[in-house]
């Protein structure tokens, strides 16, 4: 299965539910992400099902992460971009315009070495602002 292009999943700053994604977290997640350390998977709505045939199975894997400066509401902000290896089911969901947004799962200090990207959910109601529709 071909990997996706890089797309934006988080931007430093506030979220719709009152949390803050820090610039430091964005930098650390991009720098530290390594599938050999912990392979982050793509799930639906932050639910990890136990049945691989059920609705809440995994929909792919994050293969790489990087940062880029973006302009958001006239301000330069640091953003996290990821590349994924999607399953055929995720591609079909996206074609049907379902679960077109993403929501990052962040551990703020994994193994006491800084923030780490633990997963990515596909959703229709993301908390973080400024993501790409993917």
Feature annotation, model-predicted:
Residues 1-134:
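N-terminal, leucine/charged-rich tether regions that mediate assembly and partner docking
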């Amino acid at each position: 299965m071909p990997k996706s292009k890089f797309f934006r999943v988080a931007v430093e700053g506030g979220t719709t539910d009152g949390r803050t994604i820090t610039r430091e977290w964005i930098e650390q997640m991009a720098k530290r992400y390594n599938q050999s350390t912990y392979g982050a998977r793509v799930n639906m709505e932050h639910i990890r099902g136990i049945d691989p045939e059920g609705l809440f199975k995994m929909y792919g894997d994050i293969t790489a992460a990087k940062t880029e400066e973006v302009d958001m509401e006239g301000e330069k902000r640091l953003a996290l971009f990821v590349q994924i290896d999607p399953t055929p089911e995720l591609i079909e969901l996206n074609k049907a315009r379902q679960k077109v947004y993403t929501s990052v799962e962040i551990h703020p200090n994994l193994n006491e070495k800084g923030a780490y990207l633990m997963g990515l959910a596909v959703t229709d109601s993301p908390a973080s602002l400024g993501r790409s529709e993917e």
